[in-house]
């Protein structure tokens, strides 16, 4: 993706599904996935590309094994990364445990302003539920933030769950539950230009279109562990190459973005170093 002067450049990484031990293998697929090693490989690769970037956006499902030790291990890996890391919970996470064990370079803000762009991070986690939900209080805070943003500024929203259907029946029942309410609210704020989500373990590039012709782009990002095949009635695993999304938020309010995959499959022997 071509570098553009004055663009706000971000990495998005999502769905690492980590464990307390780097030796742990992902249990819900037969594919040989060691989530901690995949995340380590991703961070090592991105570390060589950080010039000109503002932050790493980590959009949920940090943990598969939801324990303090897992979040402490993830925190250690992320604090070795030379950019601020902004993160939100996914359905596999425990938000309170994240807050208690993530620190230093790793933050859980609701609002980050970078130039004319505002990054709004929504926590769509709901205890014991695979789908995404926002409470009335969260919607109220979201609306207040939008009201506070100047009309000549721009908004990029980050959430774990997808706010539009992606065409896979088994996954679409686990998207954002209140998507209609969400889009009705966003309709009043033309500053909102784009939504980025995780959760779906596949690349998705779509949009929500309003009756008047306005569109808001929606981009889903593949995981750092295992990928799933798109447009399926039932879950089908695809491959194990970790992915990230490169994001450029331009000064005129437009967005450029592209998904990349590591050029190799992460195997247990691929990374021997202990970060």
What are these model-predicted stretches?
Residues 1-73:
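N-terminal active-site segment of His-dependent metallophosphoesterases
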Residues 2, 67-154, 178-191, 209-222, ...:
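Extended active-site neighborhood of metal-dependent phosphoesterases/phosphodiesterases
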Residues 7-23, 116-125, 156-158, 216-222, ...:
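Active-site-proximal beta-strand elements of phosphoester/diester hydrolases
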Residues 12-14, 55-61, 85-91, 123, ...:
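Active-site neighborhood of phospho(di)ester-bond hydrolases with catalytic His/Asp-centered motifs
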Residues 17-22, 64-69, 92-97, 127-130, ...:
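Active-site environment of divalent metal-dependent phosphoester hydrolases
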Residues 25-33, 128, 169-174, 233-235:
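Short glycine-enriched, charge-decorated loop/helix-capping segments at active-site entrances
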Residues 36, 207-275:
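Binuclear metal-dependent phosphoesterase catalytic core
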Residues 42-55, 132-217, 255-256, 273:
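His/acidic metal-ligating clusters that form di-metal
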């Amino acid at each position: 993706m071509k570098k553009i002067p004055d663009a706000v450049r971000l990495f998005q990484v999502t769905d690492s599904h980590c464990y307390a031990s780097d030796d742990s293998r992902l249990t819900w697929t037969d594919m040989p996935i060691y989530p901690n090693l995949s995340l380590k490989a991703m961070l090592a690769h991105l570390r060589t590309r950080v010039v000109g970037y503002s932050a790493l956006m980590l959009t949920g499902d940090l943990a598969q094994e939801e324990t303090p030790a897992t979040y402490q291990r993830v925190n250690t890996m992320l604090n070795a990364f030379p950019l601020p890391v902004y993160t939100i919970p996914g359905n596999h996470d425990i938000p309170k445990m994240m807050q208690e064990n993530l620190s230093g370079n790793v933050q859980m803000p609701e609002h980050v302003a970078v130039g004319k762009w505002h990054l709004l991070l929504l926590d769509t986690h709901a205890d014991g539920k695979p789908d995404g939900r926002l409470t009335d209080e969260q919607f109220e805070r979201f609306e207040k933030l939008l009201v506070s943003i100047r009309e000549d500024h721009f908004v990029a929203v980050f959430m774990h769950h997808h706010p539009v259907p992606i065409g896979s029946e088994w996954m679409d029942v686990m998207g954002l539950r209140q998507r209609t309410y969400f889009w009705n609210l966003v309709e009043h704020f033309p500053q909102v230009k784009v939504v980025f989500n995780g959760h779906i373990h596949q690349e998705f590039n779509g949009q929500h279109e309003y009756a008047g012709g306005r569109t808001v782009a929606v981009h889903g990002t593949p995981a750092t562990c295992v990928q799933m095949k798109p447009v399926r009635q039932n879950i089908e695993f695809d491959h194990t190459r970790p992915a990230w999304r490169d994001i450029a938020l331009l000064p005129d309010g437009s967005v450029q973005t592209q998904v990349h995959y590591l050029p190799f499959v992460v195997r247990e022997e691929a990374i021997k170093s202990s970060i």
